[in-house]
């Protein structure tokens, strides 16, 4: 895990600072807006984000820009076998992409998972999303040899990537 950035999660922005923190119930409406912006072709509906919040509140982090709202989030699914988990979603608003916020969200949640004694972290990514694949590789994730065809249904192939903590 030596590739993780420093432990300071505060990141300068044009209007002050953003803070990575645990999601709160009052964040859910704003989280829906953020998810719709980050994933316009397939955002989570409110009820799904609500259920994921109810199931995994300790492993759902947001990038809070204060009065400017939420700019990113990462969501981890923790099954009963807490030694293995899945990154279910990582999203950053368009105006904040390319600034390292996705990396910081991932680093924060990976530190949290390491502290929770998780040994294996998996995620899926669209095979054409080279930017995300490179981010995950830079954090130590390794890709399976080939994308899984129709992983999320017809024409929704995904590359499965794994990190051993």
Locations of regions flagged by a protein language model:
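Active-site acidic-Proline motif in GNAT/NAT acetyltransferases
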Residues: 93-95, 99, 127-128
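Conserved catalytic-core motifs of GNAT/GCN5-like acyltransferases
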Residues: 122-125, 137, 142-158
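Short aromatic/hydrophobic contact patches that present stacked aromatics
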Residues: 89-91, 122-124, 160-162
């Amino acid at each position: 895990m030596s590739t993780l950035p420093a432990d300071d999660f505060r990141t300068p922005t044009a209007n002050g600072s953003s803070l990575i923190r645990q999601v709160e119930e009052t964040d859910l409406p704003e989280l829906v807006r953020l998810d719709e912006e980050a994933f316009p072709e397939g955002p989570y509906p409110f009820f799904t984000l609500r259920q994921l919040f109810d199931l995994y509140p300790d492993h759902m982090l947001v990038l809070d820009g204060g009065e400017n709202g939420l700019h990113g989030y990462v969501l981890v699914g923790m099954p009963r076998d807490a030694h293995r988990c899945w990154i279910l979603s990582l999203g950053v608003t368009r105006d904040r992409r390319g600034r390292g916020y996705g990396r910081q969200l991932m680093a924060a949640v990976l530190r949290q998972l390491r502290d929770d004694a998780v040994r294996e972290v998996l995620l899926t990514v669209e095979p054409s999303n080279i930017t995300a694949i490179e981010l995950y590789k830079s954090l130590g994730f390794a890709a399976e040899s080939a994308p899984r065809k129709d992983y999320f249904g017809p024409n929704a192939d995904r590359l499965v990537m794994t990190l051993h903590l």
